[in-house]
Structures are given as structure tokens and as C-alpha cells.
Amino acid sequence: QALYSAPKEVFERLSAFAANGGTLVATFKTGFTDEHVKVNCDRQPAGLSECMGAWYDRFTAPKNVGMSGETFGVSKDELQAQDFMELVEPTGAKVIAFYDHYMWKEYAAVTKNSWGKGTCYYIACKTSSAYIKKLTASIVKEAGLWGWKQEIAFPVIIKEGVNQEGKKIRYLFNYSGKEQSVKLPKEASKVSRVLKEEGVVLKKDRLTLAPWGFVVEEI
């Protein structure tokens, strides 16, 4: 989701986060207005154009606009700009994907820019689910944040948090009406205790969740 409205200070902190070694990913319509929903007159994406190494001042609704460049193995049918696209011009950023269209082929659809110790990515259009999944997986892996939890996809959901006692808690949910089975690595079996479960079967490294089943663990 785009950070459509926010005060200038928020974007300054995001830029500083990336400069200090973070990975920042922003999408189309980010920074379009301030906290009062007044359109920013700065170069778009306002407050982030410098760290993104790219900017735009025009946008349009795509019609039969494909994407070229890094495809991540996604089929041609899935390489389409959808609903909204910004005509981004790089000022230092590397272009990951261009628009595949005779009128818009010089403009960037996805960019990557080194900023201080970190990296900034800008996604200038709505893409297919298949493409955005591949793109974000690539970004997470490059940032060194990919682990076994990222291998598990919807409808099995994993959430973690800290309870009032300061204990780390993990929740695994089956958000569907069908039984789901996932393979767990050894590190996932390091559980202090199971707090609550419903419709759960664990055999060796295979966890099976009944429809709408869940397990809550202290780890």
C-alpha cells in the first residue's frame, strides 16, 4: 500500500533509514499529499525522489502496457501494468523494469537505487500478483531477511509478537476452508510450550492444519 499522505518529517525519516543501511520499498502514489491531503508541489514521489534516484510529474491509466527488463520468470500475460502507472524518469537509479509500450518505453516501471549504506526501490505501477510476489521475494532475499517463514504462503499465515509477560509468541493460522500442510525446519520445532491449538497434527517435520485450524506457541 502507498503512503499517500504523511508529513514531510516522515519521509525524511524514511530516507535516513535507508541511508543508514535499511531497505526502503515505496509504491506508486507514495508521498502524493501532505498530512492535510494537500498535493505536494515537490518532485514526486515527494520527499523521496532524491533517495529513490528517480522522479515523475505525469501519470496515466495503462492500456495494453506490458513490462520489460527483469521478469523473474513471470509469464508474459502476468507482465502487465494495471489500473495506474507513473511515468518515472531515473536520475541515478538502476531500472529493473521498463514499460513495454511504444509510447512509454523510455519510462521506468520499477527502479533500484543505492542510497548511503542502504537501498531504495520504487514500484511505479500496479502489477500482477505473480510479478509483485517475485519482485518482493527478490528484495527480501537481497536484504538477507529471507527465512523459513517466508517460504510459507497464504492461506497459512504466521504472526509473531511479544505478550504482556515479555514472552515471544508465534501464531500459525489456516485462513481457509481446506486442510493445509506445511513443512517446518528444525528451528521451527524449538517451542517452549503450546498455549492453544485447534485442528493441528504434527508428524515429524510436517504440520497439518484443519480448515480454520491454528496453533499458538511460546517460543
Model-derived features: positions:
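A conserved amphipathic helix/loop scaffold
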Residues: 2-219
